[in-house]
UniProtKB/Swiss-Prot annotation:
GO BP term (any one): mitochondrial cytochrome c oxidase assembly
Keyword Transit peptide applies: yes
Keyword Ribosomal protein: no
Assigned protein family: Belongs to the COX16 family.
Pfam families: COX16
Keywords: Membrane, Mitochondrion, Mitochondrion inner membrane, Transit peptide, Transmembrane, Transmembrane helix
Predominant cellular place of this UniProt entry's protein: mitochondrion
Protein's recorded name: Cytochrome c oxidase assembly protein COX16, mitochondrial
Extra remark beyond the main annotation: Present with 672 molecules/cell in log phase SD medium.
Transmembrane segments annotated in the record for this chain: 33-53
Gene Ontology CC annotation, any one: mitochondrion
Function: Required for the assembly of the mitochondrial respiratory chain complex IV (CIV), also known as cytochrome c oxidase. May participate in merging the COX1 and COX2 assembly lines.
Length: 118
């Protein structure tokens, strides 16, 4: 035997509950569940989507501000400021050969610092 979820109320308490807003809503909800629960839920979802669309529009407007058309003068300035291209230089830069001009040097230890030899 299990306990039911229904709260025990005296006759007087039950009449007061049924006259309250919560009691009337529960009674109407049991008769027409879609009208009193499903429809407001769906309306909240749809209206929330419209309300939040303004926030997503801001995101796309900021992206549009970043992307602009470039006129011919700007293109000429960009091309003028470019560094010269040499295929051999790019090859060596990509190979990282210029970064191999270093020598590993051990850092001097502090006094009383162990060697950490395993």
């Amino acid at each position: 035997m299990s306990f039911s979820g229904k709260k025990f109320r005296s006759r007087r308490q039950q009449l007061v509950y049924e006259a309250s807003l919560a009691g009337r809503y529960k009674k109407a909800l049991s008769k027409h569940p879609f009208l009193f629960f499903g429809l407001p839920f769906c309306a909240t979802i749809v209206l929330g989507s419209f309300w939040l669309s303004s926030f997503t529009a801001i995101k796309y407007e900021q992206g549009d501000r970043k992307v602009q058309e470039i006129n011919e003068e700007d293109i000429l300035k960009i091309r003028k400021n470019q560094r010269e291209f040499d295929i051999k230089e790019e090859y060596y830069r990509l190979q990282g050969l210029s970064e191999e001009d270093w020598e590993p040097v051990r850092v001097a230890r502090l006094k009383d610092e162990s060697e950490n030899v395993w």
